[in-house]
A protein has these predicted regions:
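Conserved, well-ordered alpha-helix/loop/beta-strand core segments that scaffold catalytic motifs
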Residues: 32, 46, 95-131, 139
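Short beta->alpha transition motifs characteristic of CBS
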Residues: 1-2, 76-81, 145-151
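Short, glycine-/polar-rich solvent-exposed loops and beta-turns at beta-strand/coil boundaries
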Residues: 22-28, 127-129, 137, 200-201
Length: 321
């Protein structure tokens, strides 16, 4: 660079946010350095138009993601040097860089597209901040679809809002409510303290625990129900009664065995940790219908898969074996 002062002025016009002081220090060292990576063709033309022989352009390989937003949270991101920093890009960074064999996922693009479209429609209807969905093969844990909204175009990472990065399907931890009642019934059957036709009579519409009220969401729920009917009618009080038969320790152990309240392994690192729970009589009661206890959608899918496939443990996976 012959006239450094003039050059710096031109650069400042092209890149107003560039640290000119640092650039000047680099120029004084008279050493090769990177001015900017991953420039556009327009930027290249403008820099070339400066007519400086000291400006060189390097061609590098980069990834192009044809599906854009569709698999953004699963695929993840890479940094300027194309090292994975999230998702599959990070977990399988070495494989993708140095292994000639293809990495094939279990995901189905058609299913992913349809589910994403439905979630986007629901977000408009309910004006929700975000949403997520997982579709898993209950027999082998293959994840066919994993959607988290809002998502992002992986090809335009520099313009993404931080909230869009959150993988709500695997990282988000939530109180999931009545879907836990399935685990309460399954726990009771597993421990042998109930049968599906076990009768629960004179169920009140409201009980108290530590001075706090627990009631039915629907006062039309009958007072006499079988264990199966408690699940069908989504009864809160009936679920509490089943949980009381199981007991705190056995209920907690059952939820741990099916991977609901302990962190599980997955092919990407963005997996949430359920919040620690101090068990007691009231916690047992509220946990029976999914309140005061947290987990991720990924773990919910695993738990339901185990119940659906006859009790066989499965490991959720994104990679075809």
């Amino acid at each position: 660079i012959k006239n450094k002062k003039n050059f710096l002025l031109k650069i400042q016009l092209l890149y107003p946010n560039k640290n000119i002081k640092k650039l000047n220090q680099n120029l004084k060292q008279n050493k090769y350095f990177y001015f900017k990576k991953n420039i556009t063709k327009e930027e290249q033309f403008k820099l070339w138009s400066l007519g400086e022989k000291g400006i060189l352009f390097e061609k590098t390989q980069t990834r192009i993601y044809p599906h854009k937003n569709l698999f953004s949270h699963v695929i993840g991101q890479v940094d300027e040097d194309h090292n994975g920093i999230s998702g599959i890009e990070k977990s399988f960074n070495d494989h993708l860089k140095f292994n000639k064999k293809s990495l094939v996922t279990t995901l189905d693009a058609n299913i992913q597209f349809l589910i994403r479209e439905e979630l986007m429609n629901f977000q408009k209807i309910f004006n929700s901040i975000g949403s997520a969905s997982i579709l898993m093969d209950v027999n082998n844990g293959n994840v066919l679809s994993l959607v988290s909204l809002p998502d992002f175009d992986i090809n335009k990472r520099q313009t993404i809002d931080d909230l869009n990065y959150i993988n709500r399907a695997t990282k988000g931890v939530y109180e999931l409510g009545s879907v836990f009642k399935t685990f309460t019934l399954a726990g009771g059957l597993n421990e042998g303290v109930i049968e599906t036709d076990s009768e629960f009579n004179d169920l009140p519409k409201k009980i108290t625990c530590a001075g706090k009220s627990i009631g039915e969401y629907d006062n039309k729920i009958p007072n006499n129900l079988t264990a199966e009917e408690i699940l069908i009618r989504s009864g809160n009080i009936g679920s509490v009664r089943i949980a009381q038969k199981i007991g705190e320790i056995k209920m907690r152990n059952f939820l741990e065995e099916i991977g609901i309240i302990n962190k599980i392994k997955f092919d990407i690192e963005e997996v949430g940790q359920p919040l620690p729970t101090k068990w007691g009589k009231c916690k047992l009661a509220t946990a029976s219908f999914g309140h005061g206890i947290t987990t991720t959608l990924l773990q919910l899918a695993k738990g339901y898969s185990i119940i659906s496939n006859g009790g066989y443990d499965i490991q959720p996976t994104l990679i075809k074996k």
